[in-house]
Curated annotation (Swiss-Prot):
Residues modified to 4,5,5'-trihydroxyleucine: 3
Residue positions where 2'-methylsulfonyltryptophan is found in the record: 2
Keywords from the named record: D-amino acid, Hydroxylation, Methylation, Toxin
Modification note: The 2'-methylsulfonyltryptophan is thought to arise from cross-linking to Cys-6, as found in other Amanita peptide toxins, followed by sulfur methylation, beta-elimination, and oxidation. The cysteine, converted to 2,3-didehydroalanine, is hydrated to D-serine.
D-threonine carried by residues: 5
Chain positions found as D-serine (Cys): 6
Role played: A toxin that binds to rabbit muscle actin with a dissociation constant of 20 nM preventing actin depolymerization, causing cellular and tissue disruption, and death.
Positions where (4R)-4,5-dihydroxyleucine occurs in the chain: 3
Origin: domain of life: Eukaryota
Protein name as it appears in the record: Virotoxin
Cyclopeptide (Ala-Pro) cross-link site: 1-7
Molecular functions (GO terms): toxin activity
Amino acid sequence: AWLVTCP
């Protein structure tokens, strides 16, 4: 999961 933890 990086799209949810990108910012």
